[in-house]
Amino acid sequence: MRLALGLSYRGGAYRGWQSQPDGLTVQDRVEEALARFADRPVRTVCAGRTDAGVHALNQVVHLDTEIEREPFSWVRGTNRYLPPDIAVQWCRPVDAAFHARNSARGRRYAYLLLESPVRPAIEAGAVGWVFRPLDATPMREAAAHLIGEHDFSAFRSAECQAASPVKNLRRIEIVRCGAYWRFEFEASAFLHHMVRNLMGCLLAVGQGVRAPQWLAEVLAAGDRRRAAPTFAPDGLYFLGPQYDANLDLPERTPAFDWLP
């Protein structure tokens, strides 16, 4: 039997999603908790591998098991063994052909940013921070140059293992909520560090360091050295994958209502 689970987590204490020999990853903690609940080893496949310090609101994983339990038993039972900064939000039985990563038709990220003369304290680790004022108009103008199918080589990390740098960036939404900004990105898939590299560039435009057209020039050049430095991971949230509606899998969790 194949199950799909939705997870929320704070990534600050972990070295990303993917399992590592030292065990200090979200996947390691999740699989340890699942194994304790199921009383046998459990392996998971995720929709999107988040980096160190990056959070998730609706990370989706699938697993195969012979254990027959009610879906919510998997939620409550696994959460019993998880640390406070990781929680299973939902569980659904799925067809054996379902694949958390390969079945996704898109993915969404949000970056939560504080604009303030003083660094965050209560929100430390949960938001990015800038102290120089931002202007939404040039940032939105710059973002428009990125929409569509492009070679995003200028925004991938040197460690990126993606077979192709060509991705379809469908939407960038920039919203201000008081002292906070929310940048939302939707694409077919993302390259390693792509959102954080885009954030660095958009902020350079928003602070008047660069003109909006500069981002189009960086994109066309395909040279990472032409772009801004990679921005901090603190405010980056994997909102989750998007699947065909007939799968009837949740695309929201309660944590979505926490974001401004």
UniProtKB/Swiss-Prot annotation:
**GO biological processes:** tRNA pseudouridine synthesis
Provide the E.C. number(s) assigned to this enzyme.
5.4.99.12
Per the record, the domain of life is Bacteria
Q: Which UniProt keywords apply?
A: Isomerase, tRNA processing
What Gene Ontology molecular-function terms does this entry list? RNA binding; tRNA pseudouridine(38-40) synthase activity
* Gene3D superfamilies referenced in this protein's UniProt entry, alphabetically: Pseudouridine synthase I, catalytic domain, C-terminal subdomain, Pseudouridine synthase I, catalytic domain, N-terminal subdomain
Locate the active site.
51
Which residues participate in substrate binding?
A: 109
Q: Which reaction does it catalyse?
A: uridine(38/39/40) in tRNA = pseudouridine(38/39/40) in tRNA
User: Would the keyword Isomerase be found if you checked this record's keyword annotation?
Assistant: yes
Q: Which InterPro entries match?
A: PsdUridine_synth_cat_dom_sf, PsdUridine_synth_TruA, PsdUridine_synth_TruA_a/b_dom, PsdUridine_synth_TruA_C, TruA/RsuA/RluB/E/F_N
Q: How does it assemble?
A: Homodimer.
Q: What does this protein do?
A: Formation of pseudouridine at positions 38, 39 and 40 in the anticodon stem and loop of transfer RNAs.
Q: Cross-referenced PANTHER family, in alphabetical order?
A: PSEUDOURIDYLATE SYNTHASE, TRNA PSEUDOURIDINE SYNTHASE-LIKE 1
Q: Which family does it belong to?
A: Belongs to the tRNA pseudouridine synthase TruA family.
Protein name per Swiss-Prot or TrEMBL: tRNA pseudouridine synthase A
Q: Which organism is it from?
A: Methylibium petroleiphilum (strain ATCC BAA-1232 / LMG 22953 / PM1)
Specify the taxonomic lineage.
Answer: Bacteria, Pseudomonadati, Pseudomonadota, Betaproteobacteria, Burkholderiales
